[in-house]
Structure formats: structure tokens, C-alpha cells
Amino acid sequence: MMLISGDIFDRAYSRESYQAVYRALESVQVPVFISPGNHDYVSMTSPWVTEKWPANVTVFTREKLTKKQISGATVWGAAFLAPEAPSLLEGFRAEPEEGFAIGILHGDTTQAKSPYCPVTAGQIRESGLHYLALGHIHEAGALQVGDTLCAWPGCPMGTGYDETGEKGVRIVELGQTVTSRFVPLNTPRFYDLETTVADDPVAAVAKLLPAAGNQDFYRITLTGASEALDLSKLQNKFSHFPNLILRDQTVPPVDPWQAVGEDSFEGTYFTLLQENLHSGDSEQQRIAQLAAVISRQLLDGGEVKLP
């Protein structure tokens, strides 16, 4: 069976997106159970009410957990009826049935007072379920509470640069024990990266990217001291990465020794530092150079950025 714990649609949906989801669900040819979440909650205008769904699909449309029996298992599920929902697992315990007891909810285990169907360890323990499939949390995770395994896959694909890394699904096997494993999907991924430009911005960007282009989404922030960058020209160097965004947060290079020789406190200070730069050992020279850079940044009223 396939369990989908909500948010297939992100609020509004189009005819094309409905038809694509319909065809995909019909093609799997196994029972599919859906628990609508806070983004695609059940309402008089939601696709769960207004549209037809394949015969192999069961959509839970009540805020109270209800059951659907199939061969070897009973599946319990509920739905959001608004953008927020109370704890739908509170006070629930599965009735003794033949086979496995499986639950599916769009719920949040991270906050006891979450407005998105908070799920607590105590509720999981008392549920009488063998397995509880959750949605809502976009990072994959799992916890065993008593006799119940509770797990969530995250999301099959990130939707922005706050959802980086591997995304995928969970495969759960029910037997004498219940086991779960995360399976990454070959969907485009998001990467939010940063690099110091130094003298070669092309090399700085290239070291963060794979050799061959792909459809992944890269946002690379360029930092450090640099002459003015031509981002358009730099972007063209990496045209084989169509989803690459470059952000310029470099600062103009500043000579930390520019005050040497001035008849001022500042000039005297940097002159003394420079004497250490020329007369000390390599460690003293490193410290003197670093002190000059930091001092220059502070005196110029800028943010301290270590070289």
C-alpha cells in the first residue's frame, strides 16, 4: 500500500495538477490512503471533495480518525478541515482487529502546542497502532514509542533553499517487527552555499559544483574582498547549470597598511604593526597581518570578516 500524509497540493490547484496526480495514483495499482493536511485541507472547494479519484484511492475526509479495512490490515486516518487542526490522535486507541493496525495523519511531533495536529510520545504509545505514518515535517525522521513505530519521510522534493539535502520516501515493512528505511529520490535538490572569492571567482564557484551540469538548484553567495564582479559574465561561465543563482556579497579590497607613515595615532599604530610584520618569525608575521586587517575593518566601521 501507499500512504500519503497530506499536502499533495499547495493550497490552490489547477486542472493539470489534479490530472497529473490522478494518473500517478491510478498507475501504482496498490491501495493508496491520503490524509489531507494544512495546505490541502478538506473543504467544499478542495479537490478531495470536488474531484473524482481512482478506485484504489481512499481519502480520509473527517477530523476524527476513521478506519478502512483491507486484507491483513486496518488503516486509520483523519484530515485537516482548516489550515490548523487540534491533536487528532488525542484519546485514540485502535480497536483490536485481525492483522496490522496502521495510522496516517498530517501531524507535528516537534511541538506539543503546535497548531498543526500536535502528536506526542504518550499519544503514540497509547494508540495501539503498529505503525503511524506522519506528514507535515519536511525533514525525514522516525521514533519508536512502545510498540508503535512512528515515521515520516520529509518531502519527496525540496521547494526552496530552506529545504536542502536529500529528499525522498520511506519504505516500511510490517512483520514480527516493523522496520522503516529512507529511500532518496532522484529529484532535483537545493543547495545553499557560500565561498570566498579571493583572486579567481570562476575557480571559487567551480569548486562547489559537480563537473557535469544538472537540474539541481544552487544558490552560491560570494564573499570576501574582491574587485567589482561581473555576475552576468560569471553566470555565463556556468550555463550548463540552468538553476544556478549567484549572489555578490563581496567587499572592495582595502589596503590595511594605508595609514603607515601618517602623523597620527592610527599611523603610529600601523607602523608598529608593520615592524612586527618585517622583523618577526612567520607566526608573528601572520598575527601582525591579521591584526592589521581586523583593525582596518573596525576603524572603517565595517563588519569584521577574517581572511
Q: Which residues make up each language-model segment?
A:
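Core catalytic region of metal-dependent phosphoesterases/phosphodiesterases
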Residues: 1-66
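Conserved beta-sheet core of the metallophosphoesterase superfamily
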Residues: 114-177
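Charged helix-capping and loop-helix junction motifs
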Residues: 15-22, 115-123, 235-236
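Accessory, non-catalytic peripheral segments of nucleic-acid enzymes
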Residues: 176-307
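N-terminal active-site segment of His-dependent metallophosphoesterases
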Residues: 1-20, 97, 292-307
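Conserved catalytic scaffold of divalent metal-dependent phosphoesterases
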Residues: 40-122, 155-156, 184, 197
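Active-site glycine-centered loops adjacent to acidic/histidine catalytic or metal-binding residues
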Residues: 6-7, 37-38, 106, 135-136, ...
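A short helix->loop->beta-strand "cap" motif at the edges of active sites that frequently abuts
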Residues: 28-32, 99, 129, 147-148
